[in-house]
A protein has these predicted regions:
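Residue-level hotspots at or immediately adjacent to binding/recognition sites across diverse folds
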Residues: 1-164
Length: 164
């Protein structure tokens, strides 16, 4: 949600937007044909991520979309925003970062676990994955703590999402 605009994303590069609290929706062209998995808003910019390493961004409330520089070819699961930084996590474990409103993303670290969620709160990014992986950054995604154990009972835990 940005500037009174909702944006929804889905299969086949589908992007729709609503400027009237979801009462009506208009199609927007993403320019891609693969599934878009997630969208985030920050600094007056929507960033959407998905299959085949696709990253698209919009600075006009989702009306038009441009390709961003994407350094990976795998599925980008989710993207989050905080402190003027977009952070995305990739199937296979890469964490990506952008500090220029989503124009260019760079690889930061590959923790080794598959990651499926990222959240931001209190100046901290947290990334999670389905094999008990939990990673933390307190410097806007520049560096990440190695896996933090969140498995106190010795069982196999699956984490898919995180929010603050």
């Amino acid at each position: 949600f940005g500037d009174n605009t909702f944006v929804a994303v889905g299969v086949s590069g589908k992007i729709v937007r609503s400027t009237d609290n979801g009462e009506t929706w208009d199609n927007a062209s993403s320019g891609i044909t693969t599934t878009i998995r997630d969208v985030s808003f920050g600094d007056n910019t929507f960033v959407a991520v998905g299959y085949s390493g696709n990253i698209v961004r919009s600075t006009d409330n989702g009306e038009t979309w441009d390709n961003a520089t994407d350094p990976v070819s795998g599925t980008i699961w989710v993207v989050g925003f905080g402190n003027n930084t977009f952070v995305a996590v990739v199937h296979g474990g890469w964490i990506l970062r952008s500090t220029d409103n989503g124009s260019n993303f760079s690889k930061v670290v590959k923790p080794g676990n598959h990651l499926t969620g990222v959240g931001f709160g209190k100046n901290t990014f947290v990334a999670v994955g389905p094999y008990g992986g939990l990673y933390r950054s307190t410097d806007n995604g520049k560096t990440w703590d190695s896996g933090i154990s969140v498995n106190p009972f010795g069982t196999s835990e699956r984490f898919d999402s995180v929010a603050f």
